[in-house]
């Protein structure tokens, strides 16, 4: 069995990576209109399952320059039995607290567009492994930092990220079963203490000068920044714990997880 797992950045992947012997593979990109000439894939055998991990970066860049889109399409040619979009997300539903693992029944874009569904069998497996199943995951263009903004968005969804809709949209054209499962880093009633849109690069690298400037501008936020960092680390470890159970559970299935439900992961 083979599965494809996507995270946005290394920090989200790190707790799971440490538990298994993932090998980093660099794959070249021929004739691309971008400064990036390759992408990295991490490979391991987990619970008798071949696992490919792709780090997509934060958000989803313009398609013309989107290396993650190219990499995802390449990895789907390996015919994985399913695809999992995971990592961290912000909570919109008051029932979800930091560290909760939440799976999305459906995904929408903040700016509108068609709805995408997670695979029903994968949702059942995720729930059996401890995930809470929510109605709607919203994919946004930027990190939603303010509690007031999250509260306003809660009318339309239960949690928010920046990648999952785009990932499942690409996968939907292949009829490979897919699911979005995220760890909650910040609850709906909590401000994110920094504007991470300013201090993080696309690959998750911290812009140290910007970070220092933000801290100097708001020194009273230092305790909140530390607390948020600890919560994010806890949520990433919770994702790793979930994936251990999830991959082991998938290994109990023969053939494709959704052999009887190929049309479920589709935009409508």
Predicted regions span which residues?
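Acidic, Ser/Thr-rich low-complexity intrinsically disordered segments
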Residues: 261-268
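Active-site rim beta-loop-alpha module in soluble metabolic enzymes
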Residues: 116-200
């Amino acid at each position: 069995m083979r599965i494809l797992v996507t995270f946005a950045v290394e920090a989200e992947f790190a707790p799971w990576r440490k538990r298994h012997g993932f090998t980093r593979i660099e794959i070249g990109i021929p004739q691309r209109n971008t400064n990036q000439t390759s992408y990295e894939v991490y490979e391991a055998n987990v619970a008798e399952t071949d696992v490919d991990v792709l780090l997509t970066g934060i958000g989803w860049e313009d398609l013309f320059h989107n290396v993650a889109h190219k990499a995802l399409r390449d990895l789907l040619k390996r015919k994985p039995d399913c695809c999992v979009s995971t990592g961290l997300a912000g909570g919109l539903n008051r029932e979800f607290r930091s560290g909760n693992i939440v799976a999305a029944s459906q995904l929408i874009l903040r700016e509108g567009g068609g709805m995408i569904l997670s695979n029903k069998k994968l949702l059942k497996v995720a729930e059996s492994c401890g995930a809470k199943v929510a109605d709607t995951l919203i994919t946004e263009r930027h990190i939603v930092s303010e509690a007031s903004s999250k509260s306003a968005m809660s009318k339309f969804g239960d949690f928010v990220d920046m990648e999952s809709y785009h990932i499942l949209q690409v996968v939907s054209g292949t009829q490979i079963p897919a699911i979005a499962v995220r760890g909650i880093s910040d609850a709906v009633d909590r401000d994110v203490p920094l504007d991470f849109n300013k201090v993080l690069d696309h690959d998750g690298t911290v812009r140290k000068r910007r970070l220092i400037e933000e801290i100097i501008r708001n020194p009273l936020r230092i305790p909140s920044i530390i607390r948020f960092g600890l919560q994010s680390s806890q949520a990433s470890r919770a994702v790793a714990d979930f994936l251990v159970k999830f991959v082991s559970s998938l290994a109990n299935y023969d053939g494709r997880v959704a052999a009887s439900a190929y049309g479920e992961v589709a935009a409508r």
